[in-house]
């Protein structure tokens, strides 16, 4: 969700793994906030009042001063999650020259620079950089899941 503009006061991204929310403030003063994922898989693309009310209650737990903030808009979308809540950044061994960088789920854009750089290195050199080795596609078949679910912060 996005609020109306307020004088900038929040100079950091705030993430709560307990409340499954994150928020930051833009240079224009809007609060941009995100929430957890639905507890059941579906392909709905509509925001709901219930989702907004739940999210607002969690934001107020952290920042009671925001009780009169006006919401300008909210949105919904698909969240591409993997079983371990971590992305897949990998060459697919069975298909020569096929690479995947997806399944980011709730990580959003936070890791885009490092992900893009390492994916480019992998494609150019045809070798997986050490930094992204844990995110190989084959980790699921090998039962070597990435143990960083908390980093997603807004998982179920």
Label each region the model flagged:
Residues 18, 60-156:
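C-terminal catalytic lobe of FAD-dependent flavoproteins
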């Amino acid at each position: 969700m996005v609020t109306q503009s307020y004088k900038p006061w929040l100079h950091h991204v705030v993430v709560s793994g307990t409340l499954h929310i994150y928020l930051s403030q833009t240079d224009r003063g809007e609060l941009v906030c995100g929430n957890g994922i639905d507890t059941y898989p579906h392909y709905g693309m509509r925001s709901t009042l219930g989702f907004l009310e739940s999210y607002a209650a969690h934001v107020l737990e952290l920042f009671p001063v925001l009780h009169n903030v006006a919401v300008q808009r909210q949105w919904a979308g698909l969240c591409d999650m993997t079983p371990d809540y971590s992305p897949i950044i990998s060459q697919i061994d069975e298909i020569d020259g096929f690479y995947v960088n997806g399944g980011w789920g709730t990580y959003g854009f936070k890791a885009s620079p490092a992900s893009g750089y390492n994916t480019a290195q992998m494609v150019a050199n045809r070798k997986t950089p050490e930094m992204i080795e844990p995110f190989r596609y084959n980790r699921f078949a090998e039962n070597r899941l990435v143990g960083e679910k908390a980093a997603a912060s807004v998982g179920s």
